[in-house]
């Protein structure tokens, strides 16, 4: 039986090992010497190509792959720069402390008591010497040459760095007692001058731009954008749109009961369901209302957001709808009839006056023996009856000028040329008392805290008024 000879390949020696043995004998293979000496084709390309191209600092070559000094920087980024303004602490001059030589016979106890250093204050303040004012010395001379005086001015400035600081004492605490006196005579009024304030409006042009303080109250109003092209217009007839709009979107749901209709309403629809009103289908938000005026009407408007589709991320996509309901129409002014005022010398009468089929009536108390018959008509007619035959006549009576209802001329009342006497209203007067409060356990009566009541105005028209002469 023949055994097969082993064909194991023997590893060739490295180029460095071959170069050591074959260089002296001259038997080196042709690829060993250029590889060891760095004279291959690639080395020659780098050697001659580096003369035209400079790659300094990039670490390209046969060195380590560290990227040079600054390292590798990602493309498209800026390498970090070091801060240039680094605060440098000023050098502190340290005085050298001389060393004391300790001998073998010196004491082993070191004294820890330091000598007290005295810092002298600054230069003393020079006080100029003032000569005594006992009299003047007058020197006379016959020489007419003007005298030349040597005048020297001395100014002294105190430097707070070299002067002793002044001692500041805390203020004395104030004390008060619990007794005080309130009296009307101690109250005095001051006459202050009222200066009218003007608002300055700065006008500018397109060339010169001037900045000025904004005028208060001139904030621009934000447009609602109710009638834009991307907003759907829907007219609502149901009156529940103004009081409880949630009933038009969802059926009876306790979660939406008690919501304020004047705020923005949010709705959540988990599944597909029909709304009570088809116009409010898929509404997820109904914004707060707004009153607008358009084409002679007062309009109640609300903007709603629909959710017709939604993405996986939860974003809702839908239309923007403008729901509106016209409240009333703005008509022209109503023609009013003036009331005549005559003297009060007429007897007790009764007038039945009607405007637009009896909107208000004026009656007088019956305190005579005659029976009065009145009826509503379009003109002022008076019917008076007695035991004899009556004669119809038109009579105008004056209105009462009591204390509570003063009669004054206005846009709806026309007086005759007779003079009107102003009625003097009685004003109650009384003694003025002084309140003296002494002590710390008192309280004022609640009536002193009440403010002055504002006088209520009584309407003179479109109401039943009782007239007495």
Swiss-Prot record:
Keywords: Capsid protein, Cytoplasmic inwards viral transport, Disulfide bond, DNA-binding, Host endosome, Host Golgi apparatus, Host nucleus, Host-virus interaction, Late protein, Microtubular inwards viral transport, Phosphoprotein, Viral penetration into host nucleus, Virion, Virus entry into host cell. A motif (Nuclear localization signal) lies at residues 1-13, 450-458. It comes from the Viruses. It is found in: Virion; Host nucleus; Host early endosome; Host Golgi apparatus. The gene is L2. GO terms for molecular function: DNA binding; structural molecule activity. GO terms for cellular component: host cell; host cell endosome; host cell Golgi apparatus; host cell nucleus; viral capsid. This is Minor capsid protein L2. Minor protein of the capsid that localizes along the inner surface of the virion, within the central cavities beneath the L1 pentamers. Plays a role in capsid stabilization through interaction with the major capsid protein L1. Once the virion enters the host cell, L2 escorts the genomic DNA into the nucleus by promoting escape from the endosomal compartments and traffic through the host Golgi network. The keyword Oxidoreductase does not apply. Interacts with major capsid protein L1. Interacts with E2; this interaction inhibits E2 transcriptional activity but not the DNA replication function E2. Interacts with host GADD45GIP1. Interacts with host HSPA8; this interaction is required for L2 nuclear translocation. Interacts with host importins KPNB2 and KPNB3. Forms a complex with importin alpha2-beta1 heterodimers via interaction with the importin alpha2 adapter. Interacts with host DYNLT1; this interaction is essential for virus intracellular transport during entry. Highly phosphorylated. Belongs to the papillomaviridae L2 protein family. Disulfide bonds join 22-28. Its main location: virion. GO terms for biological process: microtubule-dependent intracellular transport of viral material towards nucleus; symbiont entry into host cell; viral penetration into host nucleus. The keyword DNA-binding applies. Pfam families: Late_protein_L2.
